[in-house]
Amino acid sequence: MENGQPSLTALTATAARAAHLIVDHEPLIFADSLALALLGDRAGELVSYHELHAAHPVLAGARTQVTCRARYTEDSLARAAGRGVTQYVILGAGLDSFAYRTPHAGGLRVFEVDHPATQDWKRRALAAAKVAVPDGVTFVPADLAADSPAGPLAAAGFDAAAPALVSWLGVTMYLTQGAVGETLAAIGGFAPGTEVIADYMLPEDMRDEAGAVYGTLVAQASAERGEPWLSFFAPGEMTDLARRSGFGSVRNVRQRQTIPAALWRRADALRPADLAVLFHATVTAPSRAGENLAKAHPPAGAKDGETGVSTARRARC
């Protein structure tokens, strides 16, 4: 990652969201109206690949993956907000645009946790597009590849005693299984009712043909740019890991299940694949590991005995 620039992973994910509005047919899966603007002067270059090769399995697969996971997460967030949840944590926020284009974002405190270089680039892109940063948005700079964001999040005012929705997308495959477990244990220390939505990659023997083709090509490209995939999980493994981390309600959602069935009746190249699965779990009893991290990082101004946030050890921007 270069100073003042986001990672290529963040750029390509944003380009896929932007291209969905340009090259794919109705019905749209997800409408990110700011993705193109956030790409800045890289927009033409990155989106042109999709325009020229819309049906290529890697490009069509990327658009399918990023739009389905974003749609599912933001639909879940809307339901959580309707139940009174007021905190939204985006681990590895990248160029996520939720807080700048969504009407109900005004009732939420949004904590965008990411590498300072990505956040600097994003601030400049927002300014260039004349998009104001809402009062409820807090940028939490953290080198998520090396350090725990627990301290920065606590200092930013996250209330670990109140439930939140935690989005952790496009990250776990770049972490070891041990690091993923540490992250889940940390999130499991949040208040009961907290939800986490993350995606993970299936092992090769659990992928269908489309998932195998896309996974092989993208894993190779990721490794070549220095961001190799390091972990893969069977759904049962993720469920067991979650149960040990304080999560009661656990769902593993296949890509086909992430959006309404009617949206798969399409005339473009977007098709569901068995490669990435969405993990959606709810904290019922805070994990001991998470509680210990929370105690180690009380929020700014907290009195003795009050606890703060605990969250992911590492993430990719």
PLM region spans:
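Short alpha-helix
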Residues: 229-255
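Core SAM-dependent methyltransferase catalytic element
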Residues: 262-289, 317
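A short, conserved alpha-helix within the catalytic core of class I
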Residues: 149, 174-187
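Rossmann-like AdoMet
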Residues: 1-89, 93-140, 147, 160, ...
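Acceptor-substrate binding/catalytic loop of class I
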Residues: 175, 221-235
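A short SAM/SAH-binding and catalytic strip from SAM-dependent methyltransferases
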Residues: 163-178
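A short acidic, Gly/Pro-enriched loop at the edge of an enzyme's catalytic core
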Residues: 151-165
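Conserved beta-strand signature within the Rossmann-like core of class I S-adenosyl-L-methionine
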Residues: 190-204
